[in-house]
């Protein structure tokens, strides 16, 4: 894994992340104009970064945040659709892969159900290789319909890629799911705002280390009239060290080369910090010394996870016992979110 050049190689995937300024849009026409702006940026970036194999844009970079519910439903996209065709043309022209945000994607029961918050991974032929729907919408603010699974897809030069979105990344389970299924690069597209800059920078580095994976973060910048976004798009090595990181500048770009062979060699040959292998071979040294074979222990030792899988309702009761039973709290009420002093109901 390398940083500082504009090249790539047969072994190294050139990855760029963009500090895209959060747009404030209201109509479908404005969304499509912004998609064309993103497309033009891709073509220009490839001229400056000839090694670029993959370009990544933040959550909300295509639509912005529609704070008006009617606008959110009216501008929700289909996949494939007009926006994806604009991106497909750009990927073909620039001969690069791309990750793009669609907020939202129409629900199958549109407009009776809330849209999804969706990312797509597109190849250099303009084909959609992965479509991921955000599993953990940023409640209580985000009103997206939740997705229900992660994916792993083969990306440029065979690098295996998973997509996650913003608040997803605050839950260690999603990182483990992606990497245990084979992901070598976890792409975290986010529209993260202050105050949690320090926490979000730390968590992506920590998850890279804990899961022996490359991480690419693309975040928004600017002020959209409601939130201020902190940028700091970054590319992180599988050892948890940052290869390149933007500041807070609008349209800042970072670029690094991710070796396919290095991460595979590490996962095969690393020992004391091979967190993926060791999780399913717990205590193998002690087992060897005890005459109990050389495989360690594979059984899950964590009671909460066993309960969650076998009895989700019991796990929910367990967490409510140490937190609260209602989705909202009366001490800081939010309109449309039921709390212990208000009746249930949807927005």
Swiss-Prot record:
One of its GO terms (molecular function) is amidase activity. The keyword Hydrolase applies. Keywords: Hydrolase. It catalyses: a monocarboxylic acid amide + H2O = a monocarboxylate + NH4(+). The active site is at residues 59, 134, 166. Disulfide bonds: none annotated. InterPro entries: Aliph_Amidase/BUP, Aliphatic_amidase, C-N_Hydrolase, C-N_Hydrolase_sf. Residues 13-260 form the CN hydrolase domain. It is an enzyme of class 3 (hydrolase). Its EC number is 3.5.1.4. Signal peptide: none annotated. Belongs to the carbon-nitrogen hydrolase superfamily. Aliphatic amidase family. Catalyzes the hydrolysis of short-chain aliphatic amides to their corresponding organic acids with release of ammonia. This is Aliphatic amidase.
């Amino acid at each position: 894994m390398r940083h500082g050049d504009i090249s790539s190689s047969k072994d190294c995937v050139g990855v760029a992340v963009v500090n895209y300024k959060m747009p404030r849009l209201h109509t479908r026409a404005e969304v499509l104009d912004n998609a064309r702006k993103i497309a033009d940026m891709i073509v220009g970036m490839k001229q400056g970064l000839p090694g670029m194999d993959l370009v990544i844009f933040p959550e909300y970079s295509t639509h912005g945040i529609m704070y008006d519910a009617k606008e959110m439903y009216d501008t929700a996209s289909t996949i494939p659709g007009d926006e994806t065709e604009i991106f497909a043309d750009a990927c073909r022209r620039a001969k690069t892969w791309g990750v793009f945000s669609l907020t939202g994607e129409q629900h199958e029961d549109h407009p009776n159900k809330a849209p999804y918050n969706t990312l797509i991974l597109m190849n250099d032929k303009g084909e959609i290789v992965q479509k991921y729907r955000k599993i953990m919408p940023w409640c209580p603010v985000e009103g997206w319909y939740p997705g229900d699974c992660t994916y792993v897809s083969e990306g440029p030069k065979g690098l295996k890629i998973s997509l996650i979105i913003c608040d997803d990344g605050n839950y260690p389970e999603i990182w483990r799911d992606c990497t245990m299924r084979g992901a070598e690069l976890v792409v975290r597209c986010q529209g993260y705002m202050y105050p949690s800059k320090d926490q979000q920078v730390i968590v992506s580095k920590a998850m890279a280390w804990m899961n022996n994976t490359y991480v690419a973060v693309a975040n928004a910048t600017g002020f959209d009239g409601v939130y201020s976004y902190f940028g700091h798009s970054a590319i992180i090595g599988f050892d948890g060290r940052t290869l390149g990181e933007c500041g807070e500048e609008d349209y800042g770009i970072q670029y690094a080369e991710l070796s396919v062979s290095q991460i595979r060699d590490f996962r095969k040959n690393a020992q004391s910090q091979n967190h993926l292998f060791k999780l399913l071979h717990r205590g193998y040294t002690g087992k060897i010394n005890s005459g109990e074979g050389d495989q360690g222990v594979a059984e899950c030792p964590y009671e909460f996870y066993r309960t969650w899988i076998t009895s989700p309702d019991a796990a929910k009761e367990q967490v409510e016992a140490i937190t609260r039973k209602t989705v909202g709290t009366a001490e800081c009420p939010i309109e449309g979110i039921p709390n212990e002093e208000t009746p249930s109901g949807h927005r």
